């Protein structure tokens, strides 16, 4: 459907009739306010909420690594690249933004890949009062540094032979695998970062 005016044709007389009534081609843009063209500012409450949620995810991941270093990894220290947990938390928030329950419907399985073998570290349920709608599998990767193997070799021969003296260095790369639990076709998204 097309809206039409009272003009019956587009002849020069009709155009002059428009101009006589005060229509000027440039005036159409002047009728709109400049701010109508600007992208709206994000809601400050949403930004604060997202930042708070991101920080709590960072803490959950750091606690998971801290808990696992003695129990599952058998090392005394885990060195994490700067802002790695921050990047992971932002990606988790991005992947959960399209889900029906958002982050609340997420169950995250945290693993560590060491020499092509995945070791399970923890299972994080974001909100136990919500039925999970998707799973995220986070795979940390060990840094492949030759100097750490040398250091471990030399320190294991002397008084530092305790298994808990070992330092694990994480790579800045990680993998996130998203699996929708409610989808009939079983949509899986794999992101390598």
Curated annotation (Swiss-Prot):
This is DNA damage-inducible transcript 4-like protein. The keyword Nucleus does not apply. It comes from Bos taurus. InterPro entries: RTP801-like (IPR012918), RTP801-like_C_sf (IPR038281). Inhibits cell growth by regulating the TOR signaling pathway upstream of the TSC1-TSC2 complex and downstream of AKT1. GO terms for cellular component: cytoplasm. It is found in: Cytoplasm. GO terms for biological process: negative regulation of signal transduction. Transmembrane segments: none annotated. The keyword Transmembrane helix does not apply. Keywords: Cytoplasm. Belongs to the DDIT4 family.
């Amino acid at each position: 459907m097309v809206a039409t005016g009272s003009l019956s044709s587009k002849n020069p007389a009709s155009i002059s009739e428009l101009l006589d009534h005060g229509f000027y081609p440039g005036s159409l843009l002047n009728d709109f306010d400049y701010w109508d063209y600007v992208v709206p500012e994000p809601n400050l409450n949403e930004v604060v909420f997202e930042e708070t949620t991101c920080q709590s995810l960072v803490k959950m991941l750091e606690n998971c690594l801290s808990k696992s270093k003695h129990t599952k990894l058998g090392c005394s220290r885990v060195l994490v690249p700067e802002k790695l947990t921050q990047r992971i938390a932002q990606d988790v928030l991005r992947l959960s933004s399209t889900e029906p329950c958002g982050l609340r419907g997420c169950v995250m399985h945290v693993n560590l890949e060491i020499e092509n073998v995945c070791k399970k570290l923890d299972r994080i349920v974001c909100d136990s009062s919500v039925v999970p709608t998707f799973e995220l599998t986070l795979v940390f990767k060990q840094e492949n540094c030759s100097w750490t193997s040398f250091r471990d070799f030399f320190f294991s021969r002397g008084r530092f032979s305790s298994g808990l003296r070992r330092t694990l260095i994480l790579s800045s790369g990680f993998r996130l695998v998203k699996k929708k639990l409610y989808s009939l076709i079983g949509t899986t998204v794999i992101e390598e970062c």
